[in-house]
Amino acid sequence: AFAQIGDGVIVFDGSAGDDETADPHAPPGYDLAFWPDNGEYANTTRFLTQADFRDHLRIEIVPRRICELAVMTDGLQMLALDVAGSRVHDRFFAPLFRTVKAGSDEETLTASLLGFMDSKRVNERTDDDKTLLLATRIIPDVPASLPDPAA
C-alpha cells in the first residue's frame, strides 16, 4: 500500500509480479502510484500536520508483489515523468535499478548514485532539492517456506 500527500513521486515496477507467463527478457515498465499534487501553485507544499490533510491524503493498494520501488522529491520530477503523457519515463528508472541490482558493495553504489545526482545532465534540468530512494529485491522470488537446514 502507498500513501502520499503533495508532490513527489512513488514509482514501482509495472510487471505483473506473480504472472508466470510474463517474458523475463521484456524491458521493464514502471507505474506511478499517484500523479504529483502540486496544489494551486508550483511551490505549494502540503503537510501531514495541516488541519485539512485528509482532503489531500491519497492511498493506493497494489495487491501484488513489487520488486522495484523508487521514492523521490519533486526536484527530479521533470526528469522522471513524461508530463505531456502523464506517465513515467521508463528510461529514467531502468538504468538506476540495473545499477542497484548489479552493485557489488555499498561504496560502489553510493559513488554511482552521487555521480548521477550531481551530474551536469541532471543539474541542468533542476535547481530544486533532489532526494531519491531506490529499493529492489535482489532475489526476485523467495519461497514462502525455506527448508529446515537442521533436517
Give the location of each predicted region.
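C-terminal catalytic subdomain
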Residues: 46-151
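Secondary-structure transition/turn motif
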Residues: 5-6, 36-37, 74, 150
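Glycine- and acidic-residue-rich phosphate-binding/metal-coordinating active-site segment common to enzymes
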Residues: 11-54
